[in-house]
């Protein structure tokens, strides 16, 4: 700890991302990246945009906002763009949550929420999940300061139906409810359908998962224009140019290339079902995921042991040393070839040769 650090730098507990090893032989199934590359149209758009890198990007990102708005049948004043959904989440904490007013989020959820709460001095009311790892909807009513949770939840992958989200919104009319939809394109209906009916709803999505653009950092929020203005006020107090030219160009084309998006998301959903079936035959317990990952535990093999053994054999999965998750591994959905290699390695670990 440095004597030059501020009290804030000393107090925060930074988020710890999944391992990123500089080794192309490693099969990465630990950070929920898309196993398929961006489409050729996206690559071409990025290449074309690189010719103007001497120029600043658009501070308002109007073209991308318009594309996202059109995708959901909304005007661009309902859309906010940020440098990845984590940045959008950070701006949202600053825009809508007040120190002293406790916000609600699930006990098992995205690890950045408690980090931001501490960073921005936001009090919290952490809600335990039900025994089946579902969200106890009624416990999210009548919050002091607001509500935030992912849907599907992370790392469980469990999806909360839209009518349940509507009940949470109806029971928090004076507080902002943030639905973090990083994995929604592998699931069912988005809460964006409720935006026009509920001025207190903010939906946050990302281009990192279903659009294969984790390396470009594009996230966005969808909500009432008054909420979007609040986000813009915070953003422009930090940096008017949070999104670069290459990211804007790639994101626009990723939205326009609907056929490729449908092909890749369909393949991932099919692979998710296949992996679930295969792991069940190997005596794994698996939560009902609608994301691009599975949260699994084995009846006999310790999760940390399985994580370490897979790592030794060139496969990275995610192990969380946290209460309630000690017996689980989170496995990102890879290509069919990656999945077969994973299953082969698992068989070697759980059924060692005599």
Swiss-Prot record:
Chain positions found as N6-(pyridoxal phosphate)lysine: 209
Keyword Transferase among UniProt keywords: yes
UniProt pathway: Amino-acid biosynthesis; L-histidine biosynthesis; L-histidine from 5-phospho-alpha-D-ribose 1-diphosphate: step 7/9
Key word Transferase present: yes
Cofactor names: pyridoxal 5'-phosphate
SUPFAM superfamilies hit by this protein: PLP-dependent transferases (SSF53383)
Name listed for the protein in its UniProt record: Histidinol-phosphate aminotransferase 1
Gene giving rise to this polypeptide: hisC1
């Amino acid at each position: 700890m440095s004597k030059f650090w501020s009290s804030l730098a000393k107090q925060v507990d930074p988020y710890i991302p999944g391992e990123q090893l500089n080794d192309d032989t490693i099969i990465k199934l630990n950070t929920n990246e898309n196993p398929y590359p961006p489409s050729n149209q996206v690559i071409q758009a990025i290449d074309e945009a690189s010719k103007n890198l001497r120029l600043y990007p658009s501070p308002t990102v109007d073209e991308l906002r318009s594309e996202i708005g059109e995708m959901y049948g909304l005007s661009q004043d309902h859309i906010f763009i940020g440098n990845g959904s984590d940045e959008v989440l950070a701006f949202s904490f600053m825009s809508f949550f007040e120190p002293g007013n406790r916000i609600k989020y699930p006990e098992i959820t995205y690890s950045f929420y408690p980090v931001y709460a501490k960073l921005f001095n936001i009090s919290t009311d952490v809600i335990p999940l039900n025994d089946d790892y579902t969200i106890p909807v009624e416990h999210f009513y009548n919050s002091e300061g607001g509500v935030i949770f992912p849907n599907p939840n992370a790392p469980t992958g469990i999806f909360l139906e839209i009518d349940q989200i509507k009940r949470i919104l109806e029971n928090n009319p004076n507080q902002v409810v943030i639905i973090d939809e990083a994995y929604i394109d592998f699931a069912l209906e988005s809460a964006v359908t409720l935006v026009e009916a509920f001025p207190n709803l903010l939906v946050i999505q990302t281009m990192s998962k279903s659009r294969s653009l984790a390396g470009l950092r594009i996230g966005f929020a969808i909500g009432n224009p008054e909420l979007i203005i609040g986000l813009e006020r915070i953003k422009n107090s930090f940096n008017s140019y949070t999104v670069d030219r290459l990211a804007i160009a790639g994101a626009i084309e990723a939205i326009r290339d609907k056929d490729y998006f449908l092909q890749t998301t369909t393949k991932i959903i099919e692979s998710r079902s296949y992996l679930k079936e295969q792991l069940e035959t190997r005596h794994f317990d698996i939560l009902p995921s609608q994301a691009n990952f599975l949260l699994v535990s084995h009846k006999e093999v310790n999760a940390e042991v399985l994580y370490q053994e897979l790592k030794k054999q060139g496969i990275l999965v995610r192990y969380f040393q946290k209460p309630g998750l000690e017996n689980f591994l989170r496995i990102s959905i890879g290509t069919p070839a990656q999945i077969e290699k994973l299953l082969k390695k698992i068989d070697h670990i759980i059924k060692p040769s005599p």
